[in-house]
Each structure stands twice: as structure tokens, then as C-alpha cells.
Amino acid sequence: MKPAARRRARECAVQALYSWQISKNDIADVEYQFLSEQDVKDVDVNYFRELLSGVASNAEYLDGLMAPVLSRQLDELGQVERAILRVSIYELSKRQDVPYKVAINEGIELAKIFGAEDSHKFVNGVLDKVAPQVRPNRK
């Protein structure tokens, strides 16, 4: 699968996770609705599904990794940034095949696309602190 298809999968995952976080609907329903309503022709759909289900089923674990390094309380974190950080930390901790630098860079790029002004700097800072904990060998 092309890297661009993976990037699109990450973008879609952030959008779907944002919806899940706000609506509190079942993740399977969010996935079905997203795939039926969005254009996913250039998306690695299998990777999208993995990110969505993986983040949803590991949300507490992922939040536990990021909470100690945040400059604010977890519940004060914006929902967009939370979705982006969850995807990136999921890749760092659960997808050893995704290179360390790729996971961090993709998180930064997602923040540039979806986040508020300068949120990419915040995301970068959090990932720089979390990454060595879950990838001590930096690979």
C-alpha cells in the first residue's frame, strides 16, 4: 500500500475518532457511518479500521501514556488534539513496523491539517516526550 493511502487512513481515523469521542457512539457504528458517508477511494481502509478499533480499545492505555506529559489536565485537551495524539501514540506503541520518525511526523502533519493554530507544536512536544517511553530504541 502506498504511503499516501496510509496518510489518508490516518486522516480518516482522526475524523472518525473525533466523532466517536464527541458522540460516545459504539465504535463499530462510527466506522460503518464513516465508511458509508465519506469518499475512501484513496484510503488504506484496512489500516483505517485497525487504527479506529485499536485506538478505541486502547484509549485508556493511550491516555495514560500522554497524561503525565501534558501541560494541562487530560479533560482540558481539545478533542481534535486528543484524537491525533491517540492515533500517533497507538502507532508508536502498537505498530513497531511504523518507523519512530514517521509516527511523530504524521502526528505533526495531522495537527497542521486538523488542529488549531500552533497545535502541531503542542503535538510534537507531547510525542517527543511519550515516544522514548514506548520506543526506547527509537526505531
From Swiss-Prot:
GO term, biological process aspect, one: transcription antitermination
The entry's keywords: RNA-binding, Transcription, Transcription antitermination, Transcription regulation
Superkingdom of origin: Bacteria
InterPro entries given in the database record: NusB-like_sf (IPR035926), NusB_fam (IPR011605), NusB_RsmB_TIM44 (IPR006027)
Cystine residue pairs: none
Record has Transcription as a keyword: yes
GO MF annotation terms: RNA binding
Any one Gene Ontology cellular component term annotated for this protein: cytosol
Pfam families: NusB
Family: Belongs to the NusB family.
Entry protein name: Transcription antitermination protein NusB
